[in-house]
Every structure is written in structure tokens, then in C-alpha cells.
Amino acid sequence: MSLLTEVETPIRNEWGCRCNDSSDPLVVAASIIGILHLILWILDRLFFKCNYRFFKHGLKRGASTEGVPESMREEYRKEQQSAVDTDDSHFVSIELE
């Protein structure tokens, strides 16, 4: 149970834990919500870059380059890469080999 719902009280020269309301539905719901919030926060921090790109650009796929000359494909690829790497006025320079 959550540390916030536990109360330590002196019992017979010892420190014990008295959790009278641990079966209260509100306490159980709050604990579950707290655990889910913590898990989602950790996942957000771990996958921040992926989440940011997903919400900013959606699930858009690049246009088909069938029948397009290689020089135009390369220019399009650079434009798409620069659009993805732009993060709130922070520009990332990537050299393609």
C-alpha cells in the first residue's frame, strides 16, 4: 500500500504499522492511478524523442519516389530529414554519406 496511507504508531514498545483503511475503494483506486501515472511518466521520459516525432508529424509516410530522378529523391530526403530533426528552433546538421 502507499506510504501516504500508512500510519506508524507506537505499539507495546515497538513501532508498528496500522493500516485500517487499506481496503477502502478510494485508497485502492488512488494507488492504481498513482502506479499507472508513474509507469506512463517513465515511458514518456524513455521514449521522449519517439513520442515527440509521433505527435508532431503523425503517422505520415513519405511520398512514393517511383519514377523520380535520383537527384530529386536526394533533395526530398534531405528536406524530410531536416523537418524531422528540427526541434523548437534547435537545428541538427546531419551529413549523409
From Swiss-Prot:
Q: Segment Disordered: which positions?
A: 62-89
A Gene Ontology cellular component where this protein is annotated is:
virion membrane
Q: Where in the cell is it found?
A: Virion membrane; Host apical cell membrane
GO biological process, any: symbiont genome entry into host cell via pore formation in plasma membrane
Q: How does it sit in the membrane?
A: Single-pass type III membrane protein
Source organism, top-level taxon: Viruses
Intravirion topological intervals: 44-97
Query: What residues show lipidation of type S-palmitoyl cysteine?
Result: 50
Instruction: List residues in topological domain: Virion surface.
Output: 1-22
Further remarks about this protein from its record:
When the channel is activated, one or more imidazole moieties of His-37 probably become bi-protonated.
Role, per record: Forms a proton-selective ion channel that is necessary for the efficient release of the viral genome during virus entry. After attaching to the cell surface, the virion enters the cell by endocytosis. Acidification of the endosome triggers M2 ion channel activity.
| Subunit details | Homotetramer; composed of two disulfide-linked dimers held together by non-covalent interactions. May interact with matrix protein 1.
Name this protein carries in UniProt? Matrix protein 2
Its lineage opens with: Viruses, Riboviria, Orthornavirae, Negarnaviricota, Polyploviricotina
